């Protein structure tokens, strides 16, 4: 298996309360099954508030409600997560732990990316003065999870990726504003 990441991937670190456009508002917040089961046993006021705010989604999964302003019910006035504060990083659901990181597996490649929907990722990406490069590392072992990607979809994904890489490599403007 080959793991491919943009060269700035490891530079990302969540800026939490300093973020002006929090990922904890305006989004549907899904809860994976393991987190859902853990939240059922979480003690205290935070656990109670979390359980009251959970709901079943149309597909049988679970989510966390948002308030009237679209903010996650666990997001406090300082734009910090009360669940994280009370129970630590390990208590967060997969979507909260992973975002803005995401990946797709196809053929023998795991492509990891950072979403430009995140303010800090944008800051990192647009402050680069050199074209983005992709770093590959070969891992041993077979992947059994291709995320249901068909051969046509994998070919299309690789073609789009080649085009985007070409655009990144052609970029020569030293000013992030010119980008």
Question: How would you label these PLM feature ranges?
Answer:
Residues 43, 164-171:
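Hydrophobic, Leu/Ile/Phe/Ala-enriched alpha-helical segments that form helix-helix packing faces
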Residues 146:
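Glycine- and acidic
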Residues 143, 161-166:
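Intrinsically disordered, low-complexity regulatory regions
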């Amino acid at each position: 298996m080959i793991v491919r990441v943009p060269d700035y991937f490891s530079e990302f670190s969540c800026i939490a309360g300093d973020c002006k456009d929090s990922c904890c508002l305006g989004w549907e917040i899904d809860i994976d099954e393991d987190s859902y089961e853990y939240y059922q046993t979480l003690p205290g006021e935070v656990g109670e508030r979390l359980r009251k705010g959970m709901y079943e989604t149309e597909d049988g999964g679970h989510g966390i409600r948002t308030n009237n302003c679209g903010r996650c019910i666990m997001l406090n006035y300082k734009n910090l997560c009360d669940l994280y504060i009370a129970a630590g990083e390990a208590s967060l659901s997969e979507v909260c732990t992973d975002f803005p990181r995401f990946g797709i597996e196809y053929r023998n490649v795991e492509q990891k990316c950072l979403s430009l929907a995140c303010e800090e990722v944008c800051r990192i990406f647009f402050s680069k003065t050199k074209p983005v490069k992709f770093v590959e590392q070969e891992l041993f072992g077979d992947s059994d999870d291709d995320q249901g990607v068909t051969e046509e979809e994998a070919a299309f994904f690789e073609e789009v990726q080649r085009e985007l890489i070409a655009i990144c490599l052609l970029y020569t403007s030293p000013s992030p504003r010119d980008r």
